Amino acid sequence: MNLPASLNKTPLYEWHAAHGGRMVDFAGWALPIQYTSIIEEHNAIRNAAGIADISHMGRLRFEGPGAAVFLAELLTRRVADMALGQIRYSLITNEQGGIIDDVLVGYYHDEFGQPFYVLVVN
């Protein structure tokens, strides 16, 4: 499949292409969806490990005394009780409970010991 040259490329694009990644247009990004067969890749992940290039995803930082309260209103999972370095899967929903996006939220401290959350969004 020939992809438009105008597609965004992650820092790992050349590696994916050189290693046989079948590249597709994913929301304006050239990303691999498959390398070998679906069954081979499924078995590899189930029996060993797998990684994904998520460098195209957005990262939002939330800090300050109201960060946990704000995220409690935005997300379907609690964040106030997270341990340092912990990551949780959560959802952002609309007023009717429909899913807008699935996200990862992490809890960290900066070099001065100040806490902050990082939200990784699609």
Each predicted region: which residue ranges?
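Basic, glycine/lysine-rich polyanion-binding surfaces/domains
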Residues: M1-N122
